[in-house]
Swiss-Prot record:
Superkingdom in the source lineage: Eukaryota
Record's comment describing the protein's domains: Consists mainly of membrane-spanning sided beta-sheets.
Record-stated family: Belongs to the eukaryotic mitochondrial porin (TC 1.B.8.1) family.
Naturally occurring in which organism (per UniProt): Solanum tuberosum (Potato)
Keywords, sorted A to Z: Ion transport, Membrane, Mitochondrion, Mitochondrion outer membrane, Porin, Transmembrane, Transmembrane beta strand, Transport
Entry's Gene Ontology cellular component terms: mitochondrial outer membrane; pore complex
UniProt-recorded name of the protein: Mitochondrial outer membrane protein porin of 34 kDa
A Pfam family hit: Porin_3
Mitochondrion keyword on record: yes
One MF annotation (Gene Ontology) recorded for this entry: porin activity
Main location group: mitochondrion
Subcellular location: Mitochondrion outer membrane
Keyword Mitochondrion: yes
Function of the protein: Forms a channel through the cell membrane that allows diffusion of small hydrophilic molecules. The channel adopts an open conformation at low or zero membrane potential and a closed conformation at potentials above 30-40 mV. The open state has a weak anion selectivity whereas the closed state is cation-selective.
Length: 276
């Protein structure tokens, strides 16, 4: 475990990654190349039904400044400039998209042994201001995440979270959507040697009185191959196999089936990521 409570986005992240990360129903491909000067170029493509989307991302690093420039098939240009450790524990991120003149955003992150703060503001005349803060330690942490629209004078987001971490388990509780959704999650490491873990998430909506319960597990078959599986209380079951056929190059295949309506057929997804 690292020092400090981390940022608000890390509350419940272990369980979310176990239950949802890398599962997909479309086809994805990406290839990354490195130039002798340190420029990293990643070309990606994804097929969703009859729609094909692609983008090219170029990353340049100069000391503690990282610049990412991405162009997609819709002629959008995304630029992100990250300044890491301008001061101890401080990170600054400037992002904008062309031709959207209202997409500019400035974000500042600060990590301390007993706090993690992230604040962002849109670079417009009437911006949306977001603030998230966590206090505590690497064992127990309490945080909040709020957004304020300066144009309407309303809070557009108001969340709170609590997490507990020890050597082999992570438990968290989140109150989202201005108090309408309560999410409890649990992650437990069964065997560090094989990366075997189990996780569960319970989401309750007060407005609809609906519960969504998802449980899952992961296991490493060998040093290069891992499997995951999950199922929820609506009968949707998913499985995933990921193989690292060369260092940093991953092949992932996943599928989902509705056990309460098998006649609808299963959904399958493929992903291939190539890195030299």
């Amino acid at each position: 475990m690292g020092k400090g409570p981390g940022l608000y986005t890390e509350i419940g992240k272990k369980a979310r990654d176990l239950l949802y990360k890398d599962y997909q129903s479309d086809h994805k491909f990406s290839i990354t190349t490195y130039s002798p000067t340190g420029v990293v170029i990643t070309s990606s493509g994804s097929k969703k039904g009859d729609l094909f989307l692609a983008d090219v991302n170029t990353q340049l690093k100069n000391k503690n400044v990282t610049t990412d420039i991405k162009v997609d098939t819709n002629s959008n240009l995304f630029t992100t400039i990250t300044v890491d450790e301008a001061a101890p524990g401080l990170k600054t991120i400037l992002s904008f998209r062309v031709p959207d003149q209202r997409s500019g955003k400035l974000e500042v992150q600060y990590l301390h042994d007993y706090a993690g703060i992230c604040t962002s503001v849109g670079l417009t005349a009437n911006p949306i201001v977001n603030f998230s803060g966590v206090v505590g330690t690497n064992i127990i942490a309490l945080g909040t995440d709020v957004s304020f629209d300066t144009k309407t004078g309303d809070f557009t987001k108001c969340n709170a979270g609590l997490s507990f971490t020890n050597a082999d388990l992570v438990a968290s509780l989140n109150l989202n959507n201005k108090g309408d959704n309560l999410t409890a999650s649990y992650y437990h490491t069964v065997s560090p040697l094989t990366s075997t873990a189990v996780g569960a998430e319970v989401n309750h909506s007060f407005s609809t009185n609906e519960n969504i319960i998802t449980v899952g597990t992961q296991h490493r078959l060998d040093p290069l191959t891992s499997v995951k599986a999950r199922i929820n209380n609506f009968g949707k079951a998913s499985a995933l196999l990921q193989h690292e056929w060369r260092p940093k190059s991953l092949f992932t295949v996943s599928g989902e089936v509705d056990t309460k309506s098998v006649d609808k057929g299963a959904k399958f997804g493929l992903a291939l990521a190539l890195k030299p």
